[in-house]
Swiss-Prot record:
One of its GO terms (cellular component) is cytosol. One of its GO terms (biological process) is D-ribose catabolic process. It comes from Photorhabdus laumondii subsp. laumondii (strain DSM 15139 / CIP 105565 / TT01) (Photorhabdus luminescens subsp. laumondii). Its main location: cytoplasm. Catalyzes the interconversion of beta-pyran and beta-furan forms of D-ribose. It is an enzyme of class 5 (isomerase). Transmembrane segments: none annotated. Belongs to the RbsD / FucU family. RbsD subfamily. This is D-ribose pyranase.
Length: 139
């Protein structure tokens, strides 16, 4: 049995196969998932698992250098927005690098998910709780 924090075999496999600048998306329960992207559906019921809990586990396994958020999150979901920014700041300290955060429209974010290696669906039921993570390198 795997000893690490991330136990989900599909997510673990995707992260292990990422190269520099490859992307994965973590989304709320309503984010449309492109038919060509690998769909990893974790949603059990409303709020389970939460977006933040999935983000916390994924970022413990994945080296991050960039993040894309829908600009609408600022006004429509300030709590999740602040939790994301706090997580990114902590991750910068742990990784020893800067993480670029870009804000794009929700429609552009949905289009951009087409380039993700995988889209992880959570049970999150709050608006604009979506992020695209860009992989960095550990050296």
């Amino acid at each position: 049995m795997k000893k690490g924090v991330l136990l989900n075999s599909e997510i673990s496999a995707v992260i292990s196969q990422l190269g520099h600048t490859d992307q994965i998306t973590i989304g709320d329960a309503g984010l449309p998932i492109p038919s060509l992207a690998q769909r990893i559906d974790l949603a059990l019921t409303q709020g389970i698992p939460s977006f933040i809990s999935v983000l916390n586990v994924v970022t413990q396994e994945m080296q991050i250098e960039a993040a894309f958020l829908a600009e609408e999150i600022i006004g429509h979901n300030p709590l999740i927005h602040q939790l994301i920014l706090t997580q990114i700041k902590e991750l910068e300290k742990q990784q020893g690098n800067s993480i670029t955060v870009d804000y794009i429209s929700h429609n552009v974010l949905k289009e951009k998910t087409k380039h993700s290696r995988a889209v992880i669906r959570t049970g999150e039921h709050s608006p604009y709780a979506n992020i695209i993570l860009g992989a960095g390198v550990t050296f």
